[in-house]
Amino acid sequence: ILQDYEVPAIEKWKIEDISPDERKNKLNEIRDRLVMKQYKVGEWPLFDLEISELEDVTILHISLDMLIADFLSINIIVDELEDNYFGDKKKTFTKELSFRDVIVYEHNRQKHPQYSETMKKDKQYWEERISTMPEAPDLPVKEDLKDTSIRQLNTYIEKERYLELQKLADDNNITLSGLILACYAEVLAYWSNSKRFSINVTMANREQVHPDIYSIIGDFTKINILEICQDYNLSFIQRVQFIQKQLWNDMEHMSYSGIEVLREMTRLKKKEVIIPYVFTSTLSMVSRKESTNHKGNLIYKISQTPQVLIDCQVMEYKEGILVNWDVREKAFPKKMIEMAFRTFSEMLIYTDTQNMLADKNVIKLPSDMKEIRKKKEVNYPYIPQLLHEGFCES
């Protein structure tokens, strides 16, 4: 922890007395610049704050490197900024615990004989599975991925639907995060050539070793390489429960990290294995009161991670749930992501949930999408033949 440091100055922009289009362009310029900003690892500060003053509202822009703060930490930062800005100061700056304390604790714990035994069992659990674990979903991805621009698609689950989904999850012995994860997997499988694949699920590794553990800032992220196997002989709720059970099993063996799993998969397959489809949920990590008691409004947010193509993020906001995909925009065929996200959103928001759970094929394309697919379908008789036979016939 730095003993001596200077808090960087906050850049202030006055965006007044201009047309709505000019205002929008100016805000987009600020956002794009902050999104693309590269921070030097190990060099203070790894964050930036700027303010835009409009005629009727003030916008605080926050940019940071997620090496210093995971998604839950960002919520903590925003909550504390808001509390102080609106004069509702809590006892947030008298914490007994620091992120450094957690790192030291973890380092010392790994030296304990009991932890060594846990590590041994967890390593065995993963090594027995790694050789048969599938790679990422086989979606139609363009080979040239030089364009790294990120686009966000989002949807909001209102309070009434949120409570309906929560009850549905409780009644079926699954978590709400697990249900949303299963919807994400269902959509990936629909557009994937393979129905058996792995997803990168980020976990907040905040063990309750201290009362302050959920109020400190740092990167507590661990990743889990979650195997998905879509068996369409099962109902959707059975597939959800299968995914939930697999996730719970994996979570019991987290001392062997997802990074180590990927490293071993790479070694066995003799090629670099990347799982670029990510799922992150902070549901139930903060109290409902904290997640709904915001005075300000979240206008824009986006994240980018090297090699990630789609990052599905789920968080409580106001009285509902905000769900977004941060997508590598140029990686996929035109309109595919819009169709996939629309399908995903409709599963969460509009679908008759009870019927969906009992159904085997839960993805129902809207009529306009069905028409597009129908036009592109061409049925030719399939005649099996050897590779050289077509050449000889010509």
Q: Which sequence ranges carry the predicted segments?
A:
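Short amphipathic alpha-helical segments
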Residues: 32-35, 78, 166, 177-185, ...
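His-Asp-centered acyl/peptidyl-transfer active-site segments
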Residues: 1-4, 27, 43, 56-57, ...
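Active-site-proximal acidic secondary-structure segment that organizes catalysis
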Residues: 52-100, 333-352
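Short amphipathic alpha-helices and their capping loops
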Residues: 1-25, 29-33, 37, 43-45, ...
